[in-house]
């Protein structure tokens, strides 16, 4: 029988609803489904407990994954996650804006049709000149939004040494630069 216990900081609360774990803190709340056969996730007092009766490699790997997810959720609701992106163009000036729940890029390589990337979850997008800052409590939502914005400006079948226009991730959580 394996058991992992993750302590909750004072400003964080957690609760389970069947297979969904919700963690709330000063930066917001994050809900995630944590389900795997023979693995239970429970909130006991001021800790999140992950238990299993099975000892096979796949179950142990899943328990480690669940532990990382819970730690990321706790970090997200206490400090948040932040990505920085850089807008780069050489000839056609791009206009990047936020409209409703999407990031809109206009005049990319002189195109007339705007390109749109959805904003995932509770991600907050701030545009300041040539820099875009994405922040939020959910690491996956913020990272997915940043990745979709970067992929939106990808130029297929062209030499990337020549066609350098785009929006690029320059700083990620846990890494100094990308």
Regions found by a protein language model. Give the residues of each.
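Ribosome-associated RNA-binding proteins
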Residues: 1-178
């Amino acid at each position: 029988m394996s058991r992992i216990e993750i302590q909750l900081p004072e400003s964080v609360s957690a609760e389970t609803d069947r297979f969904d774990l919700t963690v709330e803190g000063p930066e917001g709340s994050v809900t995630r489904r944590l389900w795997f056969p023979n693995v239970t996730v429970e909130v006991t007092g001021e800790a999140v407990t992950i238990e299993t009766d099975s000892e096979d490699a796949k179950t142990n790997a899943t328990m480690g994954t669940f532990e990382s997810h819970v730690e990321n959720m706790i970090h997200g609701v206490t400090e948040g996650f932040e990505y920085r992106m850089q807008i780069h163009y050489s000839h056609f000036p791009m206009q990047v804006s936020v409209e409703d729940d999407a990031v809109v890029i206009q005049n990319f390589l002189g195109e007339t049709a705007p390109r749109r990337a959805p904003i995932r979850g509770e991600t907050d997008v701030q545009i300041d000149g040539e820099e875009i800052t994405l922040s939020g409590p959910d690491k996956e939502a913020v990272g997915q939004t940043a990745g979709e914005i970067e992929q939106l400006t990808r130029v297929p079948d062209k030499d990337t040494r020549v066609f350098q226009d785009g929006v690029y991730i320059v700083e990620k959580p846990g890494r100094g630069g990308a």
